[in-house]
A protein has these predicted regions:
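Phosphate/pyrophosphate-binding loop motifs in nucleotide- or prenyl diphosphate-using proteins
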Residues: 1-173
Length: 173
């Protein structure tokens, strides 16, 4: 008798390994990147980049349990994307900024936060099994790309960044 998959949202849900948490995190990340793409249709390059990143975050997702799908070429593409956005917003990212602005920028900041959670989940996986270093590089860079994209979208929308000065660390940085 075939299993009825309507009662199973994810086949690995009952596993106790951290790989499952990483996969759920990166699924959430890809979903939020998809939301961000729907809010940036008026910015075609951002929209296209986000659709690409949604797909790549799923490749990152499967690269722990399965074959490593993230390759050096993918890391280079992401690095070039980062450089392209930094060139546009360099003057706006010299300080820590509040996650605010347009709805699209706020969703991109949420994506950035999800990417950081994915990095943390990947670290947890690495305490249980070997994780290719390229996956860490990609996940960290992805968070940074999403940050500069958020700032870029605010720039396109004519919204100024609001600097944040931390009272806890101001003498330590």
């Amino acid at each position: 008798m075939a299993k009825d998959f309507r009662y199973l949202c994810y086949p690995y849900m009952r596993e106790s390994v951290s790989t499952v948490d990483f996969e759920i995190r990166t699924d959430s990340l890809s979903t939020k990147i998809g939301l961000a793409s729907s809010l940036t249709e008026h910015l075609p390059k951002v929209h296209d980049d986000l659709l690409y990143l949604a797909e790549m975050s799923y490749h990152l997702n499967g690269s722990v349990r399965g074959m490593t799908a993230i390759k050096e070429e993918d890391l280079n593409t992401l690095s070039q994307m980062y450089d392209r956005y930094v060139l546009e917003v360099e003057d706006r990212i010299q300080t820590f900024v509040l996650p605010q602005g347009s709805t699209a920028a706020c969703v991109l900041h949420t994506c950035r936060s999800e990417a950081k959670k994915s990095v943390r989940a990947l670290h947890k996986v690495s305490t249980e099994m070997k994780v290719e270093n390229i996956l860490f590089k990609y996940a960290h860079l992805l968070a940074n790309v999403l940050f500069v994209m958020a700032v870029y979208v605010n720039k396109c929308e004519g919204i100024e960044e609001i600097p944040f000065v931390c009272k806890s660390y101001k003498d330590k940085i």
